[in-house]
């Protein structure tokens, strides 16, 4: 990591100085930033900003000032309040982190810089294509990727190995959805407990259906085609058998209590996975948690959801915009970007960062869970295609209704199955038809 830091510093010193030949102003040009990385006091990004300010910032008379560190939801609301000139709203900063939904909700998207005006085609081509494309809105590069996460499979190896010794379960079974759900059904039969929890049922279907070569969306709704039925069958079978966690909340909780063995969740949730399981009887044990690439369908493409905010720059003056770009080019330079993301558990955003700097950085990591996560990142980036959702105004509504209704229908189906009088096969399709009827298209 020290070597990467030295490379990062050299990049800072080699960046071109703006206004060459002109007299430097006494006061630095200060540009402001709202971000989500850490807290006000303990933030890896704030530490890097301090380094920038004392090196290339000092050379070019630029100072980056962090005005707000919060969560993405709060920043979304604050940006829209400022853009709409709501009473009491703060002024927009020069830079803020954003999902596409924030840009789409702006009253005027033209208030944002188009990064194509400041980055050459070659510079933009250095980014992972899907990461860059997600930030292309209305034909403009409105969002610049900084960090990314994805969805990975977390497994409690201690519990899995204990059960596998008796059942014959294998880690290869965890590489496909068919295998995961078959294990979930078997585990429920053997132990009476859940095996698998997915944080994002909507994403399982969305990415899964697309990986099978079929469109998941149709117009402003969901297309319930043969691919959807293909994804529903093993999912519902495991749910009806009791092997799929159907409660609300995040996947970290049932793994923390031993109520599930395997989860699929955002890789960023690595922060919340514990190496101690506390059981309902208040006993506890140390466990080993590791990660693997997200499962795929046996006959499907290797497709996986990408996640994470990027950075928007607000139009102002050429000087202020150039100052922001100088900072962002530094932060996304491969060596610096790897130093940044590995302090947080995220993925870098350029191919060179993955190929040249990330493997070396992984060798320096000491936490086995993070070593496993970054090995999973490297495998995922090499073998998978990153998927990002379409830009739909009603996307969040479709997602929230889907998550609630899918769990509700399978929970009701599970009750019917336990009461008897219904076969599992019949309930698989009855729950699907009921779900489609209530959800709509």
Per-range role (PLM):
Residues 27-39, 61-68, 94-95, 142:
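Short, well-ordered beta-strand elements
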Residues 58-127, 162-163, 261-262, 280-283:
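Extracytoplasmic "Venus flytrap"/periplasmic binding protein-like
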Residues 97-152, 181, 286-295:
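Hinge/lid segment of periplasmic solute-binding proteins
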Residues 116-127, 172, 214-231, 237, ...:
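Short, solvent-exposed loop/beta-turn-alpha elements that line the ligand-binding surface or hinge
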Residues 138-146, 151-153, 178-227, 260-262:
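Extracytoplasmic/periplasmic solute-binding protein
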Residues 181-186, 218-249, 290-294:
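Glycine-centered hinge/linker elements that transmit conformational signals in sensory
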Residues 237, 241-243, 280-352:
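Extracytoplasmic/periplasmic substrate-recognition and gating elements
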Residues 363-364, 371, 375-441:
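Conserved C-terminal helix/tail region of periplasmic/extracytoplasmic solute-binding proteins
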């Amino acid at each position: 990591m020290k070597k990467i830091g030295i490379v990062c510093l050299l990049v800072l010193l080699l960046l071109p100085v703006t206004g060459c030949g002109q007299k430097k102003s006494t006061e630095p040009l200060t540009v402001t930033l709202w971000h989500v990385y850490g807290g006000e006091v303990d933030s890896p990004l704030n530490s890097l900003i301090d380094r920038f300010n004392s090196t290339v910032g000092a050379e070019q008379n630029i100072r980056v000032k962090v005005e707000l560190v919060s969560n993405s939801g709060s920043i979304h609301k604050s940006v829209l309040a400022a853009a709409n000139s709501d009473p009491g709203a703060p002024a927009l900063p020069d830079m803020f982190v954003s999902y596409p939904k924030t840009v789409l909700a702006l009253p005027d998207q033209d208030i944002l810089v188009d990064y194509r005006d400041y980055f050459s085609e070659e510079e933009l081509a250095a980014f992972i294509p899907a990461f860059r494309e997600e930030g292309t809105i209305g034909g403009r590069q409105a969002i610049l990727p900084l960090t990314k996460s994805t969805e990975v499979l977390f497994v409690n190896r201690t519990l899995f190995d204990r059960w596998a010794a008796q059942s014959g379960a294998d880690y290869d079974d965890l590489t496909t959805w068919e295998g995961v759900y078959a294990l979930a059904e078997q585990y429920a039969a053997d132990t009476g407990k859940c095996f698998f929890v997915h944080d994002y049922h909507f994403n399982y279907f969305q990415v899964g259906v697309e990986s099978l070569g079929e469109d998941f969306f149709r117009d402003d709704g969901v297309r319930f085609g043969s691919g959807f039925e293909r994804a529903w069958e093993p999912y519902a079978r495991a749910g009806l058998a009791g092997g799929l966690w159907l409660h609300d909340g995040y996947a970290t909780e049932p793994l923390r209590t031993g109520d599930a063995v395997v989860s699929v969740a955002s890789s960023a949730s690595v922060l919340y996975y514990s190496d101690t399981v506390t059981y309902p009887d208040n006993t506890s044990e140390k466990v080993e948690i590791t990660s693997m690439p997200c499962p795929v369908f046996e006959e499907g493409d290797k497709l996986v959801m990408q996640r994470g905010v990027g950075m928007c720059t607000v139009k102002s003056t050429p000087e202020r915009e150039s100052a922001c770009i100088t900072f962002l080019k530094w932060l996304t330079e491969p060596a610096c970007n790897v130093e940044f993301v590995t302090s947080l558990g995220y993925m870098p955003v350029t191919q060179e960062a993955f190929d040249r700097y990330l493997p070396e950085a992984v060798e320096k990591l000491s936490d086995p869970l993070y070593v496993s996560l970054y090995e999973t990142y490297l495998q995922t980036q090499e073998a998978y295609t990153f998927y990002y959702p379409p830009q739909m105004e009603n996307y969040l509504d479709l997602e929230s209704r889907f998550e609630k209704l899918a769990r509700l229908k399978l929970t009701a189906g599970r009750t019917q199955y336990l009461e008897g009088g219904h076969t599992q096969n019949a309930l698989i399709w009855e729950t699907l038809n009921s779900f489609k009827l209530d959800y709509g298209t």
